[in-house]
Every structure is written in structure tokens, then in C-alpha cells.
Amino acid sequence: MASQGTKRSYEQMETDGERQNATEIRASVGKMIDGIGRFYIQMCTELKLSDYEGRLIQNSLTIERMVLSAFDERRNRYLEEHPSAGKDPKKTGGPIYKRVDGKWMRELVLYDKEEIRRIWRQANNGDDATAGLTHMMIWHSNLNDTTYQRTRALVRTGMDPRMCSLMQGSTLPRRSGAAGAAVKGVGTMVMELIRMIKRGINDRNFWRGENGRKTRGAYERMCNILKGKFQTAAQRAMMDQVRESRNPGNAEIEDLIFLARSALILRGSVAHKSCLPACVYGPAVASGYDFEKEGYSLVGIDPFKLLQNSQVYSLIRPNENPAHKSQLVWMACNSAAFEDLRLLSFIRGTKVSPRGKLSTRGVQIASNENMDTMESSTLELRSRYWAIRTRSGGNTNQQRASAGQISVQPAFSVQRNLPFDKSTIMAAFTGNTEGRTSDMRAEIIRMMEGAKPEEVSFRGRGVFELSDEKATNPIVPSFDMSNEGSYFFGDNAEEYDN
């Protein structure tokens, strides 16, 4: 677990590595990227896609989803045992878009899962290459985080829509492993735990018997993952209390909601990784670039450089704005759905707008949408500067018990002030006397009250020119202090559940 002194870098989590040095990590991440790229090239050949069609992000998503479904052991077993009409459990597929006579056509393809698994393993030197699969899951998760606001899911578990900046990774599948756990936000972990506790309340046998033992193990593991994200002793102590509860119930739910609220100021540490669509890695590998030999990192300049030199296209609906579609995908590629918009605008070099101001729906096209009116355009995924990713949460002082970035989960280690209205957040803590009163609660509230809005996070850290690969000359941006840059606030983005 992350906080027990076994800190592994994201890259190690990403590649299931034991402790490796930086060069080995860069090589093993590069190897993973090579595998995804080779697989994508092979799939484009199988599907007879032109170069342009192969760079279409919608085709990339279908191909990624096919391989993820082919390796989803649990769901495959479930489908075998519960056959449903018209679904062949051994096959996987989806929409592939091709350009025919100057028009975009949708073609539904179907493949044996066995065949897809064979192509994937072949592209990955015979391995299952779980790290590559997880990498694609995180890309899908980052895209969902940028596209949808999870208000309804928050309300359902008794949380507040204002906590949406804690929801990174809320659509990641359970099987996403250590790399997946690292990128999940505090709110996501709290929501998973609350759902579990609610099941226990409603189903008397949930914690009992042989199965209940496994369930209990999973519960404690999830508690430990969440505990590892908190950076203050009081928050961690509360997590111990939740984990050790004999019979988790409403008191634990209250504690978890309290902790989630506290994370709006006392930020948890949540990893950020730049995971790009397979249609970016494919052409790069095809052009002869050797990621394993050159080395690759998900948290440094590499993804920025790769995006600078990539051509990716997207289908555009009649009333969508291509520039807005580009922003959506750019944010997803940089795992920046919860980063401060002032900062993103600076890095990107063009204004980044809140979700509600974008005239664009999600990237995926539903099967009932009319293809006759579909156009396509180039996604502008380049940036003006690059910056190092962070997982610190942006807390300001070294005891790590101060104001983090309110309503924002920082993705980049770049200096910024914390423009926030603390009174609004503290109001959430008054008059809520449910749950336990404890020294820990008092201590957490005291730390939050001490948070000063005028403080600066990541002091002295800056962005870098793209030519500055060794990060030698940080450029510290200056921002308009008054204006808080949250992507989802005051907003009406579509819901993921729709």
C-alpha cells in the first residue's frame, strides 16, 4: 500500500515492477507502449483501415474496448454462465467508421475474443501484458472524467455534487490493479466503500460465510488504499476506525462522507498519468520509433512531445465545435479534468473553458446517431509548454496539513495561489452532528479552519518550454487571483450514467 513505506513510482505500478531504477522503469513503460502500438497497427491491418481511418479516435476507442473485453475474465465467465439472447459470449466487437464515397459509414465488426487475445499477446511478445490493458483503462477513465460530471452518482451515495473534483477514476473497472488504485480520487474510494457498506446493511449475509471473508478482505484493502491517499494523521486515524469496525454501518458512512468533505481542503494524494489513445502509439511505432529503447515516462515531457507530433482525427456532429472537442480530448490526454483552468490555459497556450461552456458531447457516437451528417476534423492536441505531473494534492506546507487546491485536484506541479471561498466549504461542516464526535473530527476541522486562501501551492515550480527537456528553466506563471479555475463548477455537463 502506498503509505506503508513501499512507495513505488506510478511507472512501477504501471508495469508491475519490483523496485527498478529510473532507466529500467522508462524502458518497461516504453515496452508497454510498444505493445499497445504494435497491437493497434495489427488491428488496423485486420480491419483494412486507411491511415486516416486508423487515426480516428472513435475507431481507436472501439479497438481498445474490444481487447479490454476480450481479457475481462470475470465478465466472460459470467456471460458463459448466464447466456442472454443475441449476445455471443465468445465474441467482441463494436462500431468501426470508414470513409466511403466522401461520407462516413458505420460498420459493426465482430471478432472471436480468442483471436483478439492472440493478436494482443503476439504484439506483446507472448505476454498477457496486463499493464498495457490497465493503461488503456486509465485512458478511458480520464476521458470519462473530462466528459461527464458525476453529480447523480454523488447524490445517490449521500455525497454533495460540489465534491466532483474528488471523483477521478470513478468509472475505472475494479480489475484495474495498483495502477488503477493510484489514480482514483478520494471521492471515488469513498463512493466504492459506501456502496459496499450499504449492501452489507441491506443483505444480512454480505459479510458472512466463506464469501463474506473475501468481502471483508476487499473492504479492508479498499480502506487501506483510501488511508494511503490521506496526508494528515487525523484523517488516517479516522480511516483506521472505519476499517476496524466490527459491523460497518451508518456511522462508518457518516465518517466517510466527513472525510470526503475534509478532502476538499486537506487534499489527498492522487496520481496523474498521461495515457493516450492507441491511435497515437500505433503510428509512432509504425514510423519506426522504439519506445523501449528510447524509454518513456507517463509523468514527464514524453507524452507532450508525442502529442506535438501526432495527427488524431475525430468525428464531429453537426452542431459541435471542433475546437471544443479538441479541448475535451486534450484534457483527457493530460489527465487534467480536475486541474485549475487558469493553469491549463497557460500550459496549452489557448483558453481552456469550463465543461458547461463547451459545445460538444462525448467522443463516442451512439449506434442510433445519424451518420449522414457526420463530419470529421483534426484534434488539436499540442501544448505551448510542458509541466511535471504531481500527485501531492497541492497542500501548501510541509506538514501536509494545510489548504490543498480547493475544488481542484492538481495534475501538474506548478505554482498557483488557492482562490477559494473557505466559508462555503466550512459551512458544510457546521450543524452536521451525525456520526461520531471525536478528537479526530475536531482536529480535522481545526486544520481546515487554519487554511489560508492567500497561500501558494507548489511554490517556485513552473512550466517548461518544449525544448527544455531536462526541465532546467522553470517559468512560473502568474494568474488572476480572483478567478477560480474549476472545470465543472456552476455547470450542466452530461451525466456519465445516461
Swiss-Prot record:
Localization: Virion; Host nucleus
Signal peptide residues on this chain, from the entry's feature table: none
Positions occupied by motif Unconventional nuclear localization signal: 1-18
Gene Ontology cellular-component annotations: helical viral capsid; host cell; host cell nucleus; ribonucleoprotein complex; viral nucleocapsid
Any one Gene Ontology BP term: viral penetration into host nucleus
Keywords: Capsid protein, Helical capsid protein, Host nucleus, Host-virus interaction, Ribonucleoprotein, RNA-binding, Viral nucleoprotein, Viral penetration into host nucleus, Virion, Virus entry into host cell
Residue segments, region Disordered: 1-21
Post-translational modification: Late in virus-infected cells, may be cleaved from a 56-kDa protein to a 53-kDa protein by a cellular caspase. This cleavage might be a marker for the onset of apoptosis in infected cells or have a specific function in virus host interaction.
Pfam families in UniProt: Flu_NP (PF00506)
GO molecular function annotations of the record: RNA binding; structural molecule activity
Biased composition (Basic and acidic residues): 8-21
Motif Bipartite nuclear localization signal, chain ranges: 198-216
Oligomer status and interactors: Homomultimerizes to form the nucleocapsid. May bind host exportin-1/XPO1. Binds to viral genomic RNA. Protein-RNA contacts are mediated by a combination of electrostatic interactions between positively charged residues and the phosphate backbone and planar interactions between aromatic side chains and bases.
Record function comment: Encapsidates the negative strand viral RNA, protecting it from nucleases. The encapsidated genomic RNA is termed the ribonucleoprotein (RNP) and serves as template for transcription and replication. The RNP needs to be localized in the host nucleus to start an infectious cycle, but is too large to diffuse through the nuclear pore complex. NP comprises at least 2 nuclear localization signals that are responsible for the active RNP import into the nucleus through cellular importin alpha/beta pathway.
Family in the record: Belongs to the influenza viruses nucleoprotein family.
Protein name as annotated: Nucleoprotein
